[in-house]
């Protein structure tokens, strides 16, 4: 995308015009006027102390502890998703390109990516942006959200804005709270117990401690059968699977070619309903292929347990020095369900499955369909060798090929020139999946034969702060902080398999040690060819990784007034802040033992890595009170990294209050994001990714491997905002903000579909291929020629024996995208009581509206790609952009009288054009399917409501009881053909959620 020079000139002109108008139209206020003494505080978005309640140039949204309570959930991911200016977050799993998950959520302001939003706790950086368990929600006193660029103050990452969770540092008493929520169908429950305790230890020490414990159960896909049956529940990678079976001519001679053939046991289970646990154990046979049903193994919300702890101790040593220490600790353990194995193996490195392997079902046949027989293999006594199952062994020549009998069409029992029956040697295909219900499963699987995840992540941050009076500088104050943060992942890798164990099982002695053989084919429950338990357990590995991110920061900030020789501007003294920050980052990755030994079936070897870097930053901020009601601010920051990245960025702002009920504000700034250590250096990691192959009819999961890219450069952005804040009458405040972000060199995690799409476009440009009704897809010869063309993308790997099946796509982050985002935010709040207008004392009412209008969201994948409009689209096939509805809005009405209060909120998300793969073929897989075509994801409206009774005196303390419901009218999510059957970024499959909250303070 070309730089938006005209927009930049407009922004500068608008800012300068605002300043000039303020200077020309503002009446002069005498400097001798004395204002009453007010408390000064440092607020998010500035390091300069200001009068409490003053309006800043940057748009800031603040949520108090009560506001967070009114959201009706302790799940911070849900609170994030509810914000109108946040896009791309989710609270349920979908296995879609969006990456929506019930296990983690981070702020994604304006949909510019989670790394474009800087997340702080108490003004300090954290190593993990997952808001679900960073700290107990009961400990959050306020949540500040700055919705424009702030890198000039906070450094890298603050492109779209800054999130600052501000915890309690003083508290007196003990508050205990229990929160329970469950869906009205009784399928899901989520419970949290938390406490907050604080005490003043004498006159100069304050101690606050808070903790929470949360556990939620599982919401399975099968608990929402309408959605599940509408969405994709089968994958082309399977077990039983499709094999590349050798082809022969009519005489029985090998032709050197293979034909994709489904395992004969596929599709023989009479239970075809995917919602039935353990059904479809032999797969689904359709379109000549075997498909793997996985819907009964997946969850919308995975079972997990979270614990978090917060503590803060403050000591006011004297009037010039205060010391404090703060501890954050959290742990998350997840036990989600998943299918028994995933497709994508080192199939080309595996030995061919010999025909002698017990259970091989592919009887050797001539081209015209006649059974073939081989010369028998004899022992030293001239007897025909047989395995323990009575299968006679064929003779092989020096090249390892089976030697056909003289009369290859007759059994030796009927003709002395005949031979023994034999099966074909079949190589593995890229669609092979190591485990399924059709053979023996590892003992580590649960009793329901489902693989359970063992996620285990831990976070901690310890910080020490000194607040002091700056010597020799009258009125100046300073803050110095050291923080040590650590995020560790010691999760078990529960879909990993031993390459050597499979190889050993394939190369077993079928005559003398058949129990050591590995049968990769399907086998009925009573079959003698089922693998032994020892074989299954040897192949399945459950090693743990040991990854660790460490962040150490040292901050030094001083702030005060500059008035050389007593000089002051008409509005007062110039405010200033100067600071320095040192950051040391370490990224340590320790793969599983099997992966270090190159013994993982799913990926290549990976060795432990450890990368570090540091950065030094200097910044300055100034506030120029030109007049009593006109202020201009400026800030600049120089941040340089030892890894070679860095930038010098600035930001300017203005606030102008022509009356006491109106304030105009504007900002213009620069921002940047340096690549993370993981983006630069991460070793190869492989997982599962869904792909729709544009060259063939293949649709399903394949292996997707990602590694670091050391060629990445910093992302850069220019931002502009202008707004007005109005308080025209008592109790009413209105805020309108226009914001614009011009983002370039965006680091994009290219999806597998991005890569396939780009490769297909290159193929069309090279070959001139145009799809028609008669030929909707390229021919096999065209595809083969393209794969051999140096212009094709080498990151796409295909099965050499079945070129129509992609098996693996390699990817990495790239500086490949630019974006221009323009939006409007509207906030209005009105508090009133009917008594004031003569209707009697019916209590206090409060009404609020929060809305975001996406004016435009244009983006470009790469300089040679077209500019696209993301607004109003699902954007499912593009990894760079989330769903961008044109409108999002929340409207609330609350009432309180005495101890009673009621609040209702209506949430609205605009419709968007559906553009994901619908997997239309699934409508033919089974009769239970509810697939329907989709062109628009309809607008989503839900109503949340709660009732609270507060200050109930119980045993010397006060109790508060709340009952409420989210999605009160049980709005059902729209069915789509996507995986999971729901667009989980903007619509929830949970249905009506009923909750109760009780807290007790004393």
Predicted regions, residues:
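N-terminal Sec signal peptide and the immediately downstream disordered periplasmic leader
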Residues: 2-84, 194, 198-199, 319, ...
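Short loop/turn motifs that connect adjacent beta-strands in outer-membrane beta-barrel proteins
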Residues: 34-36, 170-173, 202-204, 318-321, ...
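N-terminal periplasmic accessory domains that precede
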Residues: 76-79, 105-108, 157-178, 193
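Extracytoplasmic beta-strand/coil segments of soluble accessory domains associated
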Residues: 80-122
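Short acidic/polar hinge/loop motifs at secondary-structure boundaries
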Residues: 124-149
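Surface-exposed, low-complexity loop segments enriched in small/polar and acidic residues
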Residues: 229-232, 268-304, 320-615, 669, ...
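C-terminal beta-barrel architecture of Gram-negative outer-membrane proteins
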Residues: 687, 845-953
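C-terminal beta-signal and adjacent terminal beta-strands/loops
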Residues: 742-744, 855-858, 905-923, 949-1002
């Amino acid at each position: 995308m070309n730089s938006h020079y005209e927009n930049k000139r407009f922004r500068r002109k608008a800012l300068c015009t605002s300043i000039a108008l303020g200077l020309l139209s503002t009446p002069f206020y005498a400097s001798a006027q004395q204002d009453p003494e007010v408390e000064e505080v440092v607020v998010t978005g500035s390091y300069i102390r200001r009068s409490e309640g003053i309006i800043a140039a940057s748009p800031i949204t603040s949520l108090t502890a009560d506001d967070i309570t009114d959201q009706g959930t302790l799940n911070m991911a849900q609170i994030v998703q509810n914000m109108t200016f946040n896009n791309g977050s989710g609270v349920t799993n979908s296995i879609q390109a969006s990456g929506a998950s019930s296990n983690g959520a981070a702020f994604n302001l304006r949909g510019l990516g989670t790394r474009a939003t800087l997340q702080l706790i108490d003004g300090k950086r954290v190593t993990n942006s997952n808001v679900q368990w960073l700290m107990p929600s009961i400990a959050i006193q306020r949540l500040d959200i700055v919705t424009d660029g702030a890198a000039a103050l906070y450094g890298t990452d603050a492109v779209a804005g800054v999130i600052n969770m501000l915890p309690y540092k003083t508290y007196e008493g003990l508050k205990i709270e229990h929160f329970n929520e469950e869906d009205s169908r009784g399928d899901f429950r989520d419970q949290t117990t938390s406490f907050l305790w604080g005490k003043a230890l004498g006159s100069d020490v304050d101690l606050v401690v808070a903790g929470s414990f949360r556990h939620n159960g599982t919401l399975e896909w099968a608990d929402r059968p309408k959605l599940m049956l509408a969405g994709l529940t089968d994958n082309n990678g399977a077990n039983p699977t499709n094999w590349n079976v050798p082809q022969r001519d009519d005489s029985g001679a090998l032709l050197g070619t293979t034909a994709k053939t489904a395992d004969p046991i596929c599709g023989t289970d009479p239970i075809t309903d995917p919602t039935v646990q353990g059904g479809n154990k032999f797969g689904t046979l359709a379109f000549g292929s075997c498909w793997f049903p996985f819907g009964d193994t997946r969850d919308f919300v995975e079972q997990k347990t979270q614990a978090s702890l917060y503590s803060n101790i403050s000591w006011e040593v004297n009037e010039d020095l205060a010391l404090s220490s703060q501890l954050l600790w959290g742990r998350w353990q997840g036990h989600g369900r998943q299918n028994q194995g995933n497709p994508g193996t080192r199939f080309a490195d595996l030995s061919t499955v010999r025909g002698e392997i017990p259970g091989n079902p592919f009887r050797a046949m001539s081209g015209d369909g006649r059974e073939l027989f081989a010369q028998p293999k004899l022992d030293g006594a001239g007897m025909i060798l047989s395995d323990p199952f009575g299968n006679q062994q064929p003779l092989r020549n020096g090249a390892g090929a089976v030697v056909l009998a003289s009369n290859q069409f007759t059994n030796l029992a009927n003709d002395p020139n005949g031979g023994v029956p034999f099966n074909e040697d079949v190589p593995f295909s890229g669609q092979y999946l190591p485990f399924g219900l059709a053979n023996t499963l590892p003992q580590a699987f649960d009793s329901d034969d489902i693989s359970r995840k063992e996620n285990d992540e831990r976070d901690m941050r310890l910080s020490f702060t000194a607040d002091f009076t700056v010597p020799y500088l009258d009125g100046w104050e300073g803050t110095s902080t050291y923080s040590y943060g650590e995020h560790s992942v010691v999760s078990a890798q529960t879909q990993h398999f031993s390459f050597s164990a499979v190889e050993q099982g394939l190369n077993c002695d079928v005559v003398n040690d058949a129990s050591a053989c590995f049968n990769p084919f399907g086998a009925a429950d009573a079959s003698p060819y089922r693998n032994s338990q020892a074989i299954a357990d040897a192949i399945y590995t459950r090693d743990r990784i040991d990854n660790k991110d460490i962040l150490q920061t040292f901050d030094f900030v001083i702030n005060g007034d500059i008035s050389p020789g007593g000089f002051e501007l008409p509005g007062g003294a110039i405010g200033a802040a100067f600071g320095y920050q040192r950051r040391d980052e370490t990224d340590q990755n320790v793969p599983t033992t099997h992966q270090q030994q190159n013994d993982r079936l799913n990926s290549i070897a990976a060795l432990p890595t450890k990368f570090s870097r540091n950065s030094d930053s200097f910044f300055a901020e100034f506030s120029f009170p030109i007049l009593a009601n006109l202020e201009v601010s400026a800030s600049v920051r120089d941040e340089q990294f030892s890894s070679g990245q860095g930038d010098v960025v600035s930001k300017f702002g203005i606030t102008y209050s022509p009356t006491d009920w109106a304030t105009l504000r504007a900002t213009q700034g620069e921002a940047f994001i340096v690549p993370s250590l993981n983006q630069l250096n991460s070793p190869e990691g492989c997982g599962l990714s869904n792909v729709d192959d544009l060259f063939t009819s293949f649709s399903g999961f394949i292996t997707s491997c990602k590694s670091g890219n050391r060629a990445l450069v910093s992302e850069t952005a220019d931002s502009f905002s202008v707004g007005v804040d109005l308080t025209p009458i008592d109790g009413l405040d209105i805020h309108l903000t226009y914001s614009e972000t011009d983002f370039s060199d965006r680091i994009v995690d290219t999806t597998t579909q991005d890569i396939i799409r780009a490769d297909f476009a290159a193929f069309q440009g090279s070959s001139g291929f145009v799809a028609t009704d008669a030929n909707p897809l390229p021919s096999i010869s065209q595809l083969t020629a393209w794969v051999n063309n140096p212009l094709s993308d080498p990151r796409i790997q295909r099965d050499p024996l079945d070129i129509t099946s992609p098996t693996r796509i390699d990817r990495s982050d790239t500086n490949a995208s630019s974006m221009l985002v323009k939006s409007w935010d509207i906030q209005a709040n009105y508090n009133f009581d009917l008594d004031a207008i003569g209707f009697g004392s019916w209590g206090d009412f409060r009404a609020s509206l929060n809305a975001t209008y996406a004016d435009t969201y244009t983006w470009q994948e790469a300089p040679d790609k077209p500019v696209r409009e993301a607004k109003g689209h699902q954007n499912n096939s593009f990894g760079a952009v989330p769903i961008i509805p044109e409108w999002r809005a929340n409207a609330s009405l609350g009432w309180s009288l005495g101890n009673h209060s009621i609040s209702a909120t209506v949430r609205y998300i605009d419709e968007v054009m559906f553009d994901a793969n619908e997997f239309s073929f699934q409508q033919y897989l089974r009769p239970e399917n509810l697939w329907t075509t989709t062109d628009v994801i309809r607008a989503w409206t839900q109503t949340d409501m709660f009732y609270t009774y507060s200050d109930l005196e119980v045993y010397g303390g006060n109790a508060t009881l709340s009952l409420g419901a989210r999605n009160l009218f049980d709005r059902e999510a729209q069915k789509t053909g996507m995986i999971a059957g729901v667009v989980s970024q903007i619509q929830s499959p949970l249905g009506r959620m009923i909750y109760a909250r009780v807290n007790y303070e004393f």
